[in-house]
């Protein structure tokens, strides 16, 4: 009989069915560029830059911005931010620029234009009679791009968090080398009138392009990145969390994965490390693949690698990290099992370290140390195995390594120890938990066991 089927009786009649559930219909798309063409968008007719500035500033003062006009202006303003390419710049086989070339953000992408005119109407506020300076253009570009960052701030952030961010951004763009062009709180007022800037594809594309440029090229106006930095590794929270995790526990990626004792990690690890991507290449298009429209559904997001994401943040919770306690649990990816493994891995790496002497007063002291260490190794290798010291180590929790951790889990029947539960409760109960966060999950799951 088919191993996928189950059998049962209905009204004394034997029934055999194959249980099938809804599967994810969306395919993860990897961002590798295979046609050797730069990312591109199409915008309306290029405007007169000064006329566009006056129109956009007028619209910002009136909290009425036309997204198409904003995008057209941001693309046209790229010519103002010329810099020098520090090294040969290539990504996915595409030559972006040579070392020493004069480049602008527009060099990184292909911006196509149609003959369709923008609105460019003065919609309110004071009309500017003179032409704006480069500093004023830079301020307007910075403020507009900051709408992207504000629209990405989650509603879970309490209090005046978003308002405080907007105020700090305004302060940046009213001091040198920028120039003050709007009154206080204008940015936040404009954001409230249209809070979904991060969902506008062309605006997101331009924000990512500016960020990619200013992250590589030293420039007087690099602070514009304050509004665009969130486009870097966007929808990569799974991969970013894994990168932070291995740095936190001081292991290589290969060494860390050896601790992932669950079958559901297999597909996610394969997905995260798909060959042909530029995950480790500095200044690659990969870093901004989401904003540049190179992937519809990211294979590196927390939802795409939910088991990995859950495990990493349960370990982070065990270690008392605020970021992990505040992160959102991926409820469809075995959070109970991941919390068990997270407890054991937290115990493995929390409050312990691997230390050795690396610096010496002179060469003789170094040689003496190496000789002594070599003797210790020889003695260890000569163990006649009459005493199985490993058993005691497994129970005491002193032996380090994936084999030892796995053995401890098996000896405890795949359940958390009381010490793990006490630690989880200790870190989560003293934290003001957000809805659906890891802190809330730990409180609800283990508080009755404390």
Curated annotation (Swiss-Prot):
Belongs to the lyssavirus nucleocapsid protein family. GO terms for cellular component: helical viral capsid; host cell cytoplasm; ribonucleoprotein complex; viral nucleocapsid. One of its GO terms (molecular function) is RNA binding. It holds the Pfam family Rhabdo_ncap. Keywords: Capsid protein, Helical capsid protein, Host cytoplasm, Phosphoprotein, Ribonucleoprotein, RNA-binding, Superantigen, Viral nucleoprotein, Virion. Encapsidates the genome in a ratio of one protein N per nine ribonucleotides, protecting it from nucleases. If expressed without protein P it binds non-specifically RNA and therefore can bind it's own mRNA. Interaction with protein P abolishes any non-specific RNA binding, and prevents phosphorylation. The soluble N-P complex encapsidates specifically the genomic RNA, with protein N protecting the genome like a pearl necklace. The encapsidated genomic RNA is termed the nucleocapsid (NC) and serves as template for viral transcription and replication. Phosphorylated by host CK2. Unphosphorylated protein N seems to have a better affinity for leader viral promoter encapsidation. Phosphorylation of protein N in ribonucleocapsid may stabilize the interaction with protein P, thereby playing an important role in viral transcription/replication. This is Nucleoprotein. The gene is N. It is found in: Virion; Host cytoplasm.
């Amino acid at each position: 009989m088919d191993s996928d089927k189950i059998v049962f009786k209905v009204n004394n009649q034997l029934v055999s069915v194959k249980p099938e559930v809804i599967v994810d219909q969306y395919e993860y798309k990897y961002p590798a560029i295979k046609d050797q063409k730069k990312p591109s968008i199409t915008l309306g007719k290029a405007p007169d830059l000064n006329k566009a500035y006056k129109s956009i500033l007028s619209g910002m003062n009136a909290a009425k911005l036309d997204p198409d006009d904003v995008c057209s202006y941001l693309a046209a303003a790229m010519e103002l931010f010329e810099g020098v390419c520090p090294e040969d710049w290539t990504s996915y086989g595409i030559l972006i620029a040579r070392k020493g070339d004069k480049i602008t953000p527009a060099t990184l992408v292909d911006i196509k234009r149609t003959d369709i005119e923008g609105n460019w109407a003065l919609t309110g506020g004071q009309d500017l009679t003179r032409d704006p300076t480069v500093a004023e253009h830079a301020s307007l570009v910075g403020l507009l791009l900051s709408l992207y960052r504000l629209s990405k701030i989650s509603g879970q952030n309490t209090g005046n968090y978003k308002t405080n961010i907007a105020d700090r951004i305004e302060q940046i763009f009213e001091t040198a080398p920028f120039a003050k062009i709007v009154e206080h709180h204008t940015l936040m007022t404009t954001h409230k009138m249209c809070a979904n800037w991060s969902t506008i594809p062309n605006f997101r594309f331009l924000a990512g392009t500016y960020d990619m440029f200013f992250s590589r090229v030293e420039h007087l106006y690099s602070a514009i990145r304050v509004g665009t930095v969130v486009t870097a590794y966007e929808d990569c929270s799974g991969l970013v969390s894994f990168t932070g995790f291995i740095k936190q526990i001081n292991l290589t990626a290969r060494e860390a994965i050896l601790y992932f004792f669950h079958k559901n990690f297999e597909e996610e690890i394969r997905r995260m490390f798909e060959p042909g991507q530029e995950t480790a290449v500095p200044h690659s298009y990969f870093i901004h693949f989401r904003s540049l429209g190179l992937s519809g559904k990211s294979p590196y997001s927390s939802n795409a690698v939910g088991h990995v994401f859950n495990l990493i943040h349960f370990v982070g919770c065990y270690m008392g990290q605020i970021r992990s306690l505040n992160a959102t649990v991926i409820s469809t990816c075995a959070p109970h099992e991941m919390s068990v493994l997270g407890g054991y891995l937290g115990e493995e790496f929390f409050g312990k370290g691997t230390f050795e002497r690396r610096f010496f007063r002179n060469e003789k002291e170094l040689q003496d140390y190496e000789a002594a260490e070599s003797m210790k190794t020889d003695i260890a290798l000569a163990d006649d195995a009459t005493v199985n010291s490993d058993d005691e180590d497994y129970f005491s929790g002193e032996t380090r390594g994936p084999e030892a951790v796995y053995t401890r889990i098996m000896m405890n029947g795949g359940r958390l120890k009381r010490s793990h539960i006490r630690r989880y409760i200790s870190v989560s109960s003293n934290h003001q938990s957000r809805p659906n966060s890891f802190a809330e999950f730990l409180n609800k799951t283990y508080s009755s066991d404390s």
